[in-house]
UniProtKB/Swiss-Prot annotation:
Family note: Belongs to the SfsA family.
Protein name (database record): Sugar fermentation stimulation protein homolog
Name of one Pfam family that matches: SfsA
Species per Swiss-Prot/TrEMBL record: Ruegeria pomeroyi (strain ATCC 700808 / DSM 15171 / DSS-3)
GO molecular-function terms, A-Z: DNA binding
Domain of life: Bacteria
Length: 230
């Protein structure tokens, strides 16, 4: 998945009200960017952090920049836009680039199911059980090389696990897919100390047949691509 416009570097001044970020461009101008991330962004939103913004000229958008990446200035990047995983995964699923899901011919995003929820992807194919795929973006790293989820309490995430378990109980494939939006991590774990209820919900869902799939990414200012399974 390539970004729609060329990203521009900036320095973060502050993130506030969750979805807003004041930034300084290289020419000294200060702009406010949209931050498409409802999480805590622990370790990613410190003032002075080098970031990459995507400009837009959409007259319908009040904010003319979107915050897409954190640049760790050591060759590694973290993707902070939580809409990116679904866009990148849709491309990978349609190309059948994920081995454990490559047999599915039809990819349907945002299908209603459960209790007023939408599954990120519903996959189907001749002779195959439907596969319900829920996607979570992983950006937290507190120990070198170890990605963690979640970075804040997520009651909604626990609800999604229960709904996946219900689909597994009906004979469908139910898959909890964690997409690691960091290039500096090669391991994954749940952050049970941050959200014990989510960790318990995950173990319950696994016991009821929900599958776990963890994917890494290639990230650069040009775009985000699905890489390997962990």
């Amino acid at each position: 998945m390539r970004f729609q416009t060329t990203l521009v570097p900036a320095r973060l001044i502050r993130r506030y009200k969750r979805f807003l970020a004041d930034c300084q461009l290289e020419d000294g101008r200060e702009v406010t960017a949209h931050c498409a991330n409802p999480g805590s962004m622990m370790g990613l939103a410190d003032p002075g952090t080098k970031i990459w913004l995507e400009p837009n000229d959409d007259p319908k958008k009040k904010l003319k920049f979107g915050w897409r990446l954190v640049d760790h200035e050591n060759g590694h990047f973290t993707g902070v836009d939580t809409s990116v995983p679904n866009r990148a995964l849709k491309t990978a699923l349609e190309r059948r680039a994920i081995p454990s899901l490559a047999a599915y011919e039809t990819v349907r995003p945002e299908v209603k199911y459960g209790q007023n929820s939408r599954i990120d992807f519903l996959l189907s194919g001749p002779g195959l059980a439907d596969a319900y795929v829920e996607v979570k973006s992983v950006t937290l790293c507190r120990e070198p090389g170890l990605a963690e989820f979640p970075d804040s309490v997520t009651a909604r995430g626990a609800k999604h696990l229960a709904e996946l378990a219900a689909m597994a109980g009906l004979g469908h494939r139910a898959i909890m897919l964690y997409l690691v939006q960091r290039t500096d991590c090669d391991r994954f774990t749940l952050a049970a100390d941050i959200d014990p209820a989510y960790a318990r919900a995950f173990e319950t869902a696994r016991a009821q047949g929900v599958e776990k799939l963890i994917l890494t990414t290639h990230i650069s200012p040009q775009g985000v691509e699905i890489a390997d399974m962990l």
